[in-house]
Every structure is written in C-alpha cells, then in structure tokens.
Amino acid sequence: MKEKFLLRNVYNEKMITDLADRIINVYSRFEKSGFIEFVLSDFQDLNFGERALKITSGLEKYLPQDYLEAIDILTKSLGPELSSEPGLTIWEGFYIMPVTDFAARNGLTHFNESMQFLYESTKRFSSESAIRPFILKYPKKSISLLKTWATDKNVHVRRLVSEGTRPRLPLGIRLPIFQKKPEMILELLDLLKDDSELYVRRSVANNLNDISKHNPKVVINILKEWQKEKTKYFAWIANHSLRTLLKKGDKQALSLLGFKNPEMKNCKLTISNSKYRIGDNLEFSLEFISIKKQKLMIDYAIHYVKANGKLSKKVFNFIKM
C-alpha cells in the first residue's frame, strides 16, 4: 500500500541537507553538520509548522548574529527563479518558507533590506506569510512599496502584492488593520485587477472575498466601479470574489451578477428518502416554472451536527442558468 502523504514530510533530511549545501556554497564558515544535527533532533515528532520553525531556529543559531550579514548570505543562497505559476508538486520550494520566516523574526528593524530579501525570495516561493509582520509594523511604508511592486515584470512579485495583503490569509497571521480599513489596499487591487496572469487575478479575488467577510459594502462598491469601467476580467473576478456573499444569499451581490428577484411558480422539491445512514447517497430533484426569461442561481444547503453537538450547514451551488 502506498504510504499516505503528510504535508510535514516536505521538510525532510534531504531538503535540510540541500538548504545547508546552498548556504555553505556562499558562506564557507557555515557549520553544516551542526545545523543538520540541530534541526533533525526530535524532528519526527514535529508537525509541519513546528518543523518549519525548527529550521528557522537552526538558521538563527548557525548564521552570523549580524542580521544584515545573515540576510545577505541567505539572499545569495536562493535558487533559480520560478518561470511561471508554481504547481502543486513543486514541494522543494517549501525550503524557502522557514528562510523567509528568518527575516520576519529577526529583520523588522531593517525594513529596506528585509523587504528586498522578500522581493527576491518570492520569485522562488511565495513570501506571503513572511511579509505580514512588516505590513503590521509599517503599514503605510509597506503599501507605498507594494504599489511599485504591483507593476513589476515578475508575476510572483505582483501576486505577492495581493496575496500578502489579504486580511485573512490561510496559515498566515491576520491583518486586522485591513479588516478595519480595507480602503487602504483597494488601490493595490485596482492596479492588479486586469493583470494578464490568472494566477494574480485569482489572488485579487481571494483578497476581495476576505474583505467581504467584514466589509461587504466595500467589496460591492469597488466591484460596481469596476463594472462601470468595463474591466476586462470583471465577470470572473466578481464571481470569485463574491462567493462568500453569494452563499449567504446577499441580494446586492446577486444583483451585481445579474441575478435579480426570481419569478417562479409551481416549485416542487423531491427527495428520494426521508431517512439516511452515513455513507448513503441522497438524491433530490427540483421542478419549477420560470415566469419570464431570467438568470437564475439555485443553491442548496446541507445541515449537519458538529462535534460540539450544534447544528450547522454548508451551502453548495446547484445550478446557474
């Protein structure tokens, strides 16, 4: 039987050895064996985040204590730039994550040098998590710099502008300043909304979806502006950025996509059975008569009992027509 893949195993002895080799190639005094031994001690018992932190701690222990010297070494040790959107199988790039965390943990008092390092590292693997402590500490300064990055020729740098400023990035610290004042990042998203790369536009939509969870009116208003401007990719971005509001049945979000108040009659929902066991298939059908020619989006919700005994639901799209 094929062994189950565990995300934590992207951090393994080979990856750590490769990282040590990259460093020693540009910094001959690096204690390779000591670094590897330190990182691998108790490694098997650690989860994904703990392994990443152990690597970062190893860098802190074995690189020069002078931050600027250390970050220069790490910059020179970076591998070749990615040529396009990274695929799901490029696990080797994960070694850069704890390297960028080194900058986030130790370089907050060196804004320019640290941000330049993150600029270079994101061309190899996203710095979306590591940039966030700098944004929290220097919000205006960071946004000013990110405006210039929004027009960078490198697609990964442009994506970082949007992904790094997401208020609710998964696996990253939240940015409450943008939850309270999302207007601060709208100019950045406006610069990226017509980006030639779907990779970037997807990030713009994800950012707007994050904002919609706290400030739905802000998202509706900016999308209305983009709609008036006849933004090239408006339909795609609107559909993806409004997904949370659409699942809530938000009337303004639905209207923005052309789903007005539906006019239907003789609606009939049929469910195959009244009782089900875990693992059974639930089949249902819906019949109705549309009174006029109109756009319709029909969702359905599955209610389930959570571990704490409370009832919750998950919304799924049934059909758009």
Go through the PLM ranges and name each one.
Residues 1-253, 283-285, 294-297:
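Surface-facing alpha-helical segments and adjacent helix-coil boundary elements at the starts of domains
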Residues 95, 261-263, 290-292:
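A generic structural signal for short, solvent-exposed coil/turn residues
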Residues 252-266:
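Proline/serine/threonine-rich low-complexity linkers at boundaries of modular beta-sandwich domains
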Residues 264-270, 274-290:
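Contiguous beta-strand segments within globular domains
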Residues 289-321:
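Contiguous segments within soluble domain cores/interaction surfaces
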